[in-house]
Amino acid sequence: MAHTLQTVVLLLGTSILHPILADVNVMKDVTLGFGQALEKCREESQLTEEKMEEFFHFWSEDFKFEHRELGCAILCMSRHFNLLTDSSRMHHENTDKFIKSFPNNEVLSKHMVNLIHSCEQQHDADLDHCWRILRVAECFKRSCQEAGVAPSMELLMAEFIMESEIN
């Protein structure tokens, strides 16, 4: 009886955690994929080496959204992947396709697009695109953390190390 109860608890726990872990892994893949454009955008956004290093800690609790250059880098990276309209707002269809280009993409795509759109609406009045996109990124990060889909720094660093060893 005790063994059966343990099995039921284990199965329930696994069925509850599996979608969350899948979402976190998709978010990790999207983050790493999006980050590939950072080096290309470093100069255009006037990002110093120090600020570029900070950027790698985007998902950490103590990451600060206080430097305009970071918003400019996100703007450039978004343009690199054709994720923005001419007015520097999210291109919903292209963003959806970008997210869906990663493994297990169907899990999170619509949710991510909705989160970003909601954050954009909150900060739409800001005329400076770099500052606005930085505020949208801050809102998006907070929303992902609240939804439990933000990847941990440990997960990202492990993946980054594995990828660098392969290349």
Swiss-Prot record:
InterPro entries in alphabetical order: Odorant/phero-bd_Lep, PBP/GOBP, PBP_GOBP_sf
Pfam families: PBP_GOBP
Keyword Disulfide bond: yes
Tissue: Antenna.
CDD domains attached to this UniProt entry: PBP_GOBP (cd23992)
Keyword annotations: Disulfide bond, Olfaction, Sensory transduction, Signal, Transport
Alphabetized SMART domains for the sequence: PhBP
Signal peptide location: 1-22
GO biological process terms on file: sensory perception of smell
Domain of life of the organism encoding this protein: Eukaryota
Disulfide bridges in this chain: C41-C76, C72-C130, C119-C139
Alphabetized GO MF terms: odorant binding
Family listed: Belongs to the PBP/GOBP family.
Record's function text: Present in the aqueous fluid surrounding olfactory sensory dendrites and are thought to aid in the capture and transport of hydrophobic odorants into and through this fluid.
Protein name in UniProt: General odorant-binding protein 1
Organism, scientific name: Antheraea pernyi (Chinese oak silk moth)
